[in-house]
Protein backbone atom coordinates (compact mmCIF):
# COMPACT_ATOMS: atom_id res chain seq x y z
CA UNK A 1 0.00 0.00 0.00
CA UNK A 2 1.52 3.28 -1.13
CA UNK A 3 -0.58 5.63 1.01
CA UNK A 4 -1.18 3.69 4.22
CA UNK A 5 -1.70 6.06 7.14
CA UNK A 6 -1.97 9.12 4.90
CA UNK A 7 -4.88 11.50 4.53
CA UNK A 8 -5.88 12.89 1.15
CA UNK A 9 -8.18 15.73 0.13
CA UNK A 10 -9.57 15.53 -3.40
CA UNK A 11 -11.73 18.24 -4.96
CA UNK A 12 -14.33 17.56 -7.62
CA UNK A 13 -14.46 13.88 -6.73
CA UNK A 14 -18.15 12.94 -6.56
CA UNK A 15 -18.96 12.30 -10.22
CA UNK A 16 -19.18 8.54 -10.83
CA UNK A 17 -17.15 8.54 -14.06
CA UNK A 18 -14.88 11.40 -13.11
CA UNK A 19 -11.13 11.53 -12.60
CA UNK A 20 -11.56 12.70 -9.01
CA UNK A 21 -13.77 9.74 -8.10
CA UNK A 22 -11.35 7.27 -9.71
CA UNK A 23 -8.54 8.90 -7.76
CA UNK A 24 -10.42 8.69 -4.47
CA UNK A 25 -11.12 4.99 -5.04
CA UNK A 26 -7.49 4.29 -5.92
CA UNK A 27 -6.15 6.23 -2.94
CA UNK A 28 -8.49 4.42 -0.55
CA UNK A 29 -7.41 1.07 -1.98
CA UNK A 30 -3.84 2.08 -1.13
CA UNK A 31 -4.74 2.82 2.49
CA UNK A 32 -5.43 6.56 2.48
CA UNK A 33 -8.25 8.13 4.40
CA UNK A 34 -9.99 10.38 1.88
CA UNK A 35 -11.96 13.62 2.08
CA UNK A 36 -14.07 14.10 -1.03
CA UNK A 37 -14.90 17.75 -1.74
CA UNK A 38 -17.60 18.59 -4.25
CA UNK A 39 -20.06 21.35 -5.06
CA UNK A 40 -22.86 18.85 -4.34
CA UNK A 41 -22.84 17.88 -0.66
CA UNK A 42 -25.12 14.84 -0.99
CA UNK A 43 -23.11 13.39 -3.86
CA UNK A 44 -19.85 13.99 -1.97
CA UNK A 45 -21.14 12.12 1.08
CA UNK A 46 -22.47 9.27 -1.04
CA UNK A 47 -19.17 8.97 -2.90
CA UNK A 48 -17.22 8.87 0.36
CA UNK A 49 -19.53 6.16 1.66
CA UNK A 50 -18.79 4.01 -1.39
CA UNK A 51 -15.01 4.05 -0.93
CA UNK A 52 -13.13 0.98 0.30
CA UNK A 53 -12.77 1.07 4.11
CA UNK A 54 -9.41 1.82 5.71
CA UNK A 55 -7.95 0.99 9.10
CA UNK A 56 -7.59 4.42 10.65
CA UNK A 57 -11.06 5.97 10.31
CA UNK A 58 -13.89 6.70 7.93
CA UNK A 59 -13.74 8.72 4.74
CA UNK A 60 -15.75 11.94 4.60
CA UNK A 61 -17.62 13.86 1.91
CA UNK A 62 -18.10 17.61 2.15
CA UNK A 63 -19.56 20.45 0.13
CA UNK A 64 -16.96 22.85 -1.21
CA UNK A 65 -17.18 25.51 -3.90
CA UNK A 66 -13.51 25.90 -4.78
CA UNK A 67 -14.20 29.29 -6.37
CA UNK A 68 -15.30 30.64 -3.00
CA UNK A 69 -12.57 31.21 -0.41
CA UNK A 70 -14.97 31.04 2.54
CA UNK A 71 -16.29 27.69 1.34
CA UNK A 72 -12.73 26.36 1.07
CA UNK A 73 -11.92 27.58 4.56
CA UNK A 74 -15.02 25.90 5.95
CA UNK A 75 -14.18 22.64 4.19
CA UNK A 76 -10.58 22.69 5.43
CA UNK A 77 -11.77 23.30 8.99
CA UNK A 78 -14.02 20.24 8.76
CA UNK A 79 -11.33 18.08 7.18
CA UNK A 80 -8.73 19.00 9.79
CA UNK A 81 -11.24 18.56 12.60
CA UNK A 82 -11.92 15.03 11.35
CA UNK A 83 -8.42 14.00 10.25
CA UNK A 84 -6.06 16.32 12.11
CA UNK A 85 -3.71 16.46 9.14
CA UNK A 86 -3.83 16.75 5.36
CA UNK A 87 -0.86 14.98 3.77
CA UNK A 88 -2.11 15.12 0.19
CA UNK A 89 -4.15 17.67 -1.75
CA UNK A 90 -5.46 16.91 -5.23
CA UNK A 91 -6.70 20.09 -6.90
CA UNK A 92 -8.92 18.26 -9.35
CA UNK A 93 -12.13 20.32 -9.57
CA UNK A 94 -12.78 21.99 -12.90
CA UNK A 95 -15.38 23.06 -15.43
CA UNK A 96 -15.24 23.71 -19.14
CA UNK A 97 -17.18 25.59 -21.81
CA UNK A 98 -16.84 25.16 -25.59
CA UNK A 99 -17.12 28.72 -26.86
CA UNK A 100 -14.92 30.79 -29.16
CA UNK A 101 -12.96 33.90 -28.25
CA UNK A 102 -15.44 36.51 -29.50
CA UNK A 103 -18.32 34.76 -27.74
CA UNK A 104 -16.78 34.72 -24.26
CA UNK A 105 -18.77 36.96 -21.92
CA UNK A 106 -17.33 38.55 -18.80
CA UNK A 107 -19.37 36.13 -16.69
CA UNK A 108 -18.04 33.17 -18.72
CA UNK A 109 -14.45 34.29 -18.22
CA UNK A 110 -14.84 34.94 -14.51
CA UNK A 111 -16.48 31.59 -13.80
CA UNK A 112 -14.04 29.47 -15.81
CA UNK A 113 -11.02 31.19 -14.26
CA UNK A 114 -12.54 31.14 -10.76
CA UNK A 115 -13.13 27.39 -10.70
CA UNK A 116 -10.16 26.16 -12.72
CA UNK A 117 -7.40 28.47 -11.51
CA UNK A 118 -8.48 30.50 -8.48
CA UNK A 119 -9.86 27.30 -6.98
CA UNK A 120 -6.35 25.83 -7.01
CA UNK A 121 -5.04 28.85 -5.13
CA UNK A 122 -7.93 28.83 -2.64
CA UNK A 123 -7.59 25.19 -1.61
CA UNK A 124 -3.80 25.32 -1.57
CA UNK A 125 -3.86 28.36 0.70
CA UNK A 126 -6.12 26.72 3.27
CA UNK A 127 -4.23 23.40 3.46
CA UNK A 128 -0.57 24.42 3.08
CA UNK A 129 -0.27 25.79 6.66
CA UNK A 130 -1.24 22.37 8.04
CA UNK A 131 1.23 20.65 5.71
CA UNK A 132 3.96 23.00 6.94
CA UNK A 133 3.14 22.22 10.56
CA UNK A 134 3.30 18.49 9.88
CA UNK A 135 6.56 18.29 7.99
CA UNK A 136 5.43 18.53 4.38
CA UNK A 137 3.00 17.08 1.90
CA UNK A 138 2.14 16.63 -1.74
CA UNK A 139 -0.10 18.80 -3.90
CA UNK A 140 -1.10 17.77 -7.41
CA UNK A 141 -3.00 20.12 -9.71
CA UNK A 142 -5.17 19.38 -12.70
CA UNK A 143 -4.18 21.27 -15.83
CA UNK A 144 -4.90 20.12 -19.40
CA UNK A 145 -3.39 19.45 -22.79
CA UNK A 146 -5.55 22.43 -23.77
CA UNK A 147 -3.09 24.68 -21.93
CA UNK A 148 -0.20 23.29 -23.96
CA UNK A 149 -1.68 23.23 -27.45
CA UNK A 150 -3.89 26.32 -27.36
CA UNK A 151 -7.34 24.87 -26.91
CA UNK A 152 -9.09 21.55 -27.08
CA UNK A 153 -12.24 19.83 -28.18
CA UNK A 154 -14.45 20.74 -25.23
CA UNK A 155 -12.74 23.83 -23.82
CA UNK A 156 -12.69 27.38 -25.15
CA UNK A 157 -9.79 29.86 -25.02
CA UNK A 158 -10.73 30.94 -21.49
CA UNK A 159 -10.43 27.32 -20.34
CA UNK A 160 -7.06 27.03 -22.07
CA UNK A 161 -5.89 30.24 -20.37
CA UNK A 162 -7.07 29.14 -16.93
CA UNK A 163 -5.38 25.76 -17.23
CA UNK A 164 -2.17 27.44 -18.41
CA UNK A 165 -2.39 29.61 -15.32
CA UNK A 166 -2.50 26.48 -13.19
CA UNK A 167 0.83 25.39 -14.68
CA UNK A 168 2.48 28.66 -13.68
CA UNK A 169 0.89 28.74 -10.25
CA UNK A 170 1.95 25.18 -9.46
CA UNK A 171 5.54 25.80 -10.51
CA UNK A 172 5.67 28.95 -8.38
CA UNK A 173 4.27 27.12 -5.36
CA UNK A 174 6.74 24.27 -5.90
CA UNK A 175 9.61 26.76 -5.75
CA UNK A 176 8.22 28.61 -2.73
CA UNK A 177 7.29 25.63 -0.59
CA UNK A 178 10.06 23.20 -1.49
CA UNK A 179 12.01 24.19 1.64
CA UNK A 180 8.95 23.11 3.66
CA UNK A 181 9.04 19.65 2.02
CA UNK A 182 5.81 20.39 0.19
CA UNK A 183 5.92 19.10 -3.37
CA UNK A 184 3.66 20.64 -6.02
CA UNK A 185 3.16 19.09 -9.45
CA UNK A 186 0.75 19.23 -12.40
CA UNK A 187 -1.02 16.66 -14.52
CA UNK A 188 -2.01 17.53 -18.10
CA UNK A 189 -4.53 15.00 -19.40
CA UNK A 190 -5.55 14.68 -23.01
CA UNK A 191 -9.01 13.48 -23.98
CA UNK A 192 -10.25 11.33 -21.09
CA UNK A 193 -13.56 9.47 -21.09
CA UNK A 194 -15.55 10.95 -18.19
CA UNK A 195 -19.09 12.16 -17.47
CA UNK A 196 -18.19 15.44 -19.19
CA UNK A 197 -16.91 13.95 -22.43
CA UNK A 198 -18.47 10.50 -22.59
CA UNK A 199 -21.74 11.33 -24.32
CA UNK A 200 -20.52 14.15 -26.54
CA UNK A 201 -18.43 12.23 -29.05
CA UNK A 202 -19.99 10.58 -32.07
CA UNK A 203 -18.39 7.40 -33.39
CA UNK A 204 -16.96 9.42 -36.27
CA UNK A 205 -15.48 12.06 -33.95
CA UNK A 206 -13.97 9.41 -31.73
CA UNK A 207 -12.35 7.57 -34.65
CA UNK A 208 -10.92 10.80 -36.03
CA UNK A 209 -9.43 11.79 -32.67
CA UNK A 210 -7.91 8.37 -32.08
CA UNK A 211 -6.05 8.66 -35.40
CA UNK A 212 -3.98 11.44 -33.85
CA UNK A 213 -3.11 9.50 -30.69
CA UNK A 214 -0.06 7.20 -30.99
CA UNK A 215 -1.42 4.79 -28.37
CA UNK A 216 -4.59 4.50 -30.47
CA UNK A 217 -7.17 4.97 -27.73
CA UNK A 218 -8.84 7.56 -25.57
CA UNK A 219 -7.83 7.82 -21.95
CA UNK A 220 -9.73 6.50 -18.95
CA UNK A 221 -10.12 8.21 -15.59
CA UNK A 222 -7.92 5.54 -14.02
CA UNK A 223 -5.05 6.53 -16.35
CA UNK A 224 -4.96 9.94 -14.67
CA UNK A 225 -5.65 8.55 -11.19
CA UNK A 226 -2.55 6.37 -11.51
CA UNK A 227 -0.42 9.48 -12.06
CA UNK A 228 -2.04 11.23 -9.10
CA UNK A 229 -1.12 8.16 -7.02
CA UNK A 230 2.50 8.39 -8.14
CA UNK A 231 2.63 12.10 -7.28
CA UNK A 232 0.93 11.60 -3.91
CA UNK A 233 3.21 8.77 -2.82
CA UNK A 234 6.87 8.56 -1.86
CA UNK A 235 7.61 7.11 -5.29
CA UNK A 236 7.85 10.75 -6.39
CA UNK A 237 9.73 12.00 -3.33
CA UNK A 238 12.24 13.93 -5.49
CA UNK A 239 9.70 15.29 -7.97
CA UNK A 240 8.36 18.82 -7.69
CA UNK A 241 7.48 21.51 -10.21
CA UNK A 242 6.89 18.79 -12.80
CA UNK A 243 4.24 18.59 -15.51
CA UNK A 244 3.20 15.05 -16.40
CA UNK A 245 1.37 14.50 -19.69
CA UNK A 246 -1.32 11.83 -19.73
CA UNK A 247 -2.47 11.98 -23.32
CA UNK A 248 -1.44 8.80 -25.10
CA UNK A 249 1.07 10.78 -27.11
CA UNK A 250 -1.49 13.26 -28.46
CA UNK A 251 1.02 16.02 -27.75
CA UNK A 252 4.64 14.98 -28.05
CA UNK A 253 6.94 17.92 -27.37
UniProtKB/Swiss-Prot annotation:
The protein's enzyme class: oxidoreductase
Residue positions of the active site: 159
InterPro entries (UniProt xref): NAD(P)-bd_dom_sf, Sc_DH/Rdtase_CS, SDR_fam
Binding site for substrate: 144
Alphabetical list of SUPFAM superfamilies matching this protein: NAD(P)-binding Rossmann-fold domains (SSF51735)
GO biological process: fatty acid elongation
Superkingdom, taxonomy of origin: Bacteria
EC code: 1.-.-.-
GO terms of molecular function: oxidoreductase activity, acting on the CH-OH group of donors, NAD or NADP as acceptor
Keywords: Oxidoreductase, Plasmid
Pfam families (UniProt xref): adh_short_C2
Binding residues for NADP(+): 10-35
Keyword Oxidoreductase (UniProt): yes
Annotated NCBIfam families: PRK07231.1
Family that this chain belongs to: Belongs to the short-chain dehydrogenases/reductases (SDR) family.
PANTHER family referenced in this protein's UniProt entry, alphabetically: BLL7886 PROTEIN (PTHR42760:SF135), SHORT-CHAIN DEHYDROGENASES/REDUCTASES FAMILY MEMBER (PTHR42760)
Protein name per its UniProtKB record: Uncharacterized short-chain type dehydrogenase/reductase y4mP
